[in-house]
Regions:
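Conserved class I S-adenosyl-L-methionine
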Residues: 166-183
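A short glycine-rich, Lys/Arg-flanked "PGG" loop and its adjoining helix->strand segment in the class I
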Residues: 145-157
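Class I S-adenosylmethionine-dependent transferase superfamily signal
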Residues: 77, 151, 178
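Core SAM-dependent methyltransferase catalytic element
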Residues: 183, 190-202
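Conserved SAM/SAH cofactor-binding pocket of Class I
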Residues: 45-133
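Glycine-rich phosphate-binding "P-loop"
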Residues: 132-142
Length: 202
């Protein structure tokens, strides 16, 4: 079975690639590698999430990038919202090492990047203003829904959970789960089969 990116220590041979990408009118330099998600470019789903994300107004707290990979979402949002601290977590150590290097390469200092299998290493009692995730679809529906449902406990009141999922990979199911957990859900936009879905903790 081919190893997927929801793996603590990928065994696939390292084949790093570096490229430049524009996100939210800013230029970024990213290095990615085999054994991490979307190693050749910033994937369309992440780009759509980055471009459509809005920080909730009047909510105090950091932002969490759950399943950050090599860091395009967290790093670009850290550049967009320099007054915010962005915490970026992943289960994949190779991805985390790349995320740290990419933050440094782009001179981003308002980030904390650390290992966590889903919310395992998140500070107990911490409440975020927003959680964003391009979830690890290949890890299976149970993992994806765990990420979405447990987000509720880590959000401040009026904080938001925003995710991107393709329709064919379970967006309608994710929408239903978020409605069930939060009592509200909005499909912010749909583009090329990708849905941006948002819920608010009320």
């Amino acid at each position: 079975m081919t190893e997927h990116y929801f793996t603590g220590k990928p065994s696939t041979k390292s084949e790093e690639q570096t490229w430049t990408f524009h996100l939210r009118d800013k230029e970024f330099h990213f290095t990615a590698d085999s054994g991490v998600f979307s190693k050749n470019t910033v994937d369309f789903g992440s780009r759509l999430l980055i471009e459509t994300f809005e920080m909730p107004e009047g909510v105090t707290g950091d932002l969490l990038d759950m399943g950050c990979g090599y860091g395009p979402i967290g790093i670009s949002l850290a550049a967009t919202f320099p007054e915010q601290t962005i915490e970026m977590v992943d289960v994949n150590q190779r991805a985390l090492d790349l995320a740290k290097r990419n933050a440094k390469a782009n001179r981003i200092s308002n980030v904390r990047i650390f290992l966590s299998s889903i919310y395992e290493n998140i500070t107990k009692g911490k409440r975020y203003a927003a959680i964003v995730t391009n979830p690890p679809i290949r890890a299976g529906k149970q993992v994806v829904h765990q990420i979405l449902s447990e987000a509720y406990d880590y959000l401040a009141i009026n904080g938001t959970l925003t995710t991107v999922i393709q329709k064919k990979q379970g967006a309608p199911s994710a929408e239903k789960k978020m409605k069930e957990v939060f009592g509200n859900v909005e499909v912010v936009t749909k583009d090329k089969g990708y849905w941006i879905i948002r819920s608010i903790k009320e």
